[in-house]
């Protein structure tokens, strides 16, 4: 199976709004519209909030509830909710000496598709991304690197397209 990786950056300005149904006093939703970029036609929706003064939390990705502090290096992917899938991901990260700082899993129904979000201490090597993307149990794998420059957030995405 041929797996290709495309790197691109999304520059965005953030705005804050409180939604009645979010369950949080203050929350922010960022929608990354990827339509037209590399023939992709999708929107990724990430919601978050702040606890206390400065404890940021990602609370939802694409409709899946999560609890995850954002980090500089992250992996987002959908996986089938079945035994052994996450073990295979963790083993491949460990073999590449990539440490997991935080991990959150959200699912809507038992045995259906779930969303995994992982904060890492370093970027994932391309060969590990290729191995993970080649798994039939993993879909929509995206490696994310987030950098902030003078109130502008630069998000570098590496979606595995196959």
Residue ranges and their predicted role:
Residues 1-149, 162:
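A conserved regulatory-domain signal marking ACT and ACT-like small-molecule sensing domains
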